[in-house]
Design a protein with these regions (language model features):
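Helix-loop "lid/cap" segments that line or gate small-molecule binding pockets
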Residues: 97-105
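Alpha-helical interface subdomain recognition
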Residues: 1-94, 106-111, 118, 122, ...
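A short core secondary-structure module
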Residues: 156-195
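A short, charged helix-loop
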Residues: 210-236
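A short, Trp-centered hydrophobic/proline-enriched beta-strand micro-motif
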Residues: 122-130
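Flexible, small-/acidic-enriched active-site or ligand-binding loops
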Residues: 141, 189-220
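Short glycine/proline-enriched turns and hinge-like loops at secondary-structure junctions
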Residues: 69, 138-140, 164-168, 205-207, ...
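Short Gly/Pro-enriched turn/cap motifs at secondary-structure boundaries
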Residues: 134-137, 161-164, 176, 201-208
Length: 382
């Protein structure tokens, strides 16, 4: 490739806007994904099993301990991980944004000392117990309750669609108290705490998804996160997770784009490569344009996040835009692959099915549109 020939997956050389350290990190993570995740991604998805052996490798790469990294660097980690598989990126996102982050920001010194080293090393797995069956988007309607009894809290309720639920050593559980929403740390062996995995998923099959039941689970006062009260706490955690998702979706899109680009260049039909036809080139060009737009968007928001000027609605527009972009590319790529596009020998169908979950979790596309609409109009349509 000549110096002036654009890189197909970075057509406008967005990587030139990265620092040397950021580029080096992305290259290191790309190598890790190529060597450790891609070789097991298809079989993990086919078997519906989370590859727990990858946790040690992820910890060695430092993805659970991002101390010293800026937000762009963290985004690049998410992008490369999802180029491998959404399920594994989801595991990392939950461990970081939804477990480590609330303990670090809202927890006591003792809670931080106990759990942060274990989470960073991968010796402990966490989950974020927020969603409930009566409506994941309506947090104010939370039915899980925590009632004070002496110096303890008693938690009763049910959480659904919880990533890492049955394999977690510690759960960050959100419950309504008489003073509003609070977060509690519940260990896996607590009396009355039960989990059951959601089976027969056609999406995110390399990720553990569980229902959690709290039947009078008693925890001490020391297990409440003391520095947070109200729904602003879980919403802040979700904003951080959505930021990583917006980056991760680009990785899935790139994986599908690279696969279909190679396929159409090699596939001979009616005496010429598929890529020699106008319709195919136009579809490939559209994919490249949309990937470039997404890359520029999250890079800019990452710089804003580092500067402390990022608004949560800007993260909503990025999650909405980038996941929709990736889902559309995966569907179009699957179509262009023809019959082989439905085989797990090709990564596109796996990414496409996974993205059907990503467009739903951490706020549906509709919710993010309404978040943006509220900021534009000053009116709440929820």
């Amino acid at each position: 490739m000549s110096q002036n020939t654009p890189n197909p997956v970075d057509f406008c050389n967005v990587s030139s806007l990265l620092s040397n350290d950021e580029r080096a990190l992305q290259q290191r993570m790309a190598t890790f994904v190529n060597e450790k995740i891609i070789p097991i991604a298809a079989s993990s998805f086919d078997d519906g099993v989370f590859p727990r052996e990858i946790i040690t490798d992820l910890a060695k790469e430092g993805v659970f301990d991002c101390t010293g990294l800026n937000n762009v660097a963290y985004g690049l980690i998410c992008q490369e991980l999802e180029r491998g598989d959404t399920g594994i990126r989801t595991f990392v996102s939950v461990q970081n944004s939804l477990v480590t982050q609330p303990i670090a920001e809202f927890g006591s010194d003792a809670q931080r000392k106990t759990w942060l080293p274990k989470l960073a090393s991968g010796d402990a797995i966490g989950c974020f117990a927020l969603t409930e069956e009566q409506g994941g988007s309506d947090l104010a309607n939370m039915q899980t309750k925590a009632v004070k009894e002496g110096t303890d809290w008693v938690i009763t309720g049910k959480k659904v669609w919880i990533t890492n639920g049955s394999i977690a050593d510690i759960a960050v559980v959100w419950a309504m108290t008489e003073d509003g929403c609070r977060a509690f740390l519940v260990e896996k062996n607590a009396n009355g705490f039960m989990t059951s995995d959601i089976e027969n998923k056609y999406s995110l099959r390399a990720s553990v998804t569980s229902n959690l039941t709290f039947d009078g689970v008693r925890v001490s006062e020391e297990m409440m996160l003391p520095n947070m009260q109200g729904l602003a706490g879980p919403l802040k955690c979700l904003t951080n997770a959505r930021y990583g998702i917006a980056w991760g979706a680009i990785g899935a899109a790139i994986a599908c784009f690279e696969e279909v680009l190679t396929h159409t260049q090699k596939r001979i039909l009616f005496g010429q490569p598929l890529a020699a036809t106008q319709s195919i080139q136009m579809r490939l060009a559209e994919m490249s344009r949309n990937i470039t737009t997404a890359q520029l968007l999250v890079l800019h928001l990452g710089r804003m996040k580092d500067a402390g000027t990022l608004h949560h609605a800007q993260v909503s527009i990025a999650k909405w835009n980038n996941v929709r972009m990736a889902l559309d590319i995966s569907r179009d790529a699957r179509d262009m692959l023809g019959a082989v596009g439905v085989s797990s020998d090709h990564c596109t169908i796996r990414h496409m099915l996974n993205l059907e979950t990503v467009v739903t979790y951490e706020g549906t596309e509709t919710v993010h549109k309404l978040v943006v609409g509220r900021e534009l109009t000053g009116l709440n349509a929820f």
